[in-house]
Amino acid sequence: MNDNNERKPLRTIKGLVISNKMQKTVTVLVERQIKHALYGKYIKRSTKLHAHDADDLCNEGDVVLMTEVAPISKTKNWRVVEIVARSD
C-alpha cells in the first residue's frame, strides 16, 4: 500500500468532435501514429470514443481535451475538460 495519499495523474487525450447528436454526449475521433513492427513506416490509427459533455457546449469539428473518469454509462468513460479549438 502507498502510505502517502498521492493520486496517479489523470490520463488526458486530445481529439476531434465528429458527432454531438446525443444529449450530453459527444463522439470524439482520436488519431494516433504507430510504427509498423517490420517495415518501420508510421501508420495512422483512429479510435472513436464517447465523452460526457455536461453543458452541451461542443459542436462538430471542435478539438477537445478529454480526461478519463469512472464509467458514466456502458460506453462513456471520458469527460470533456476543455475545448481547445472551435470549428469555423
UniProtKB/Swiss-Prot annotation:
GO terms for molecular function: rRNA binding; structural constituent of ribosome. Keywords: Ribonucleoprotein, Ribosomal protein, RNA-binding, rRNA-binding. One of its GO terms (biological process) is translation. InterPro entries: NA-bd_OB-fold (IPR012340), Ribosomal_uS17 (IPR000266), Ribosomal_uS17_bact/chlr (IPR019984). The keyword tRNA processing does not apply. It holds the Pfam family Ribosomal_S17. The keyword DNA repair does not apply. GO terms for cellular component: cytosolic small ribosomal subunit. Part of the 30S ribosomal subunit. Belongs to the universal ribosomal protein uS17 family. This is Small ribosomal subunit protein uS17. It comes from Xylella fastidiosa (strain M23).
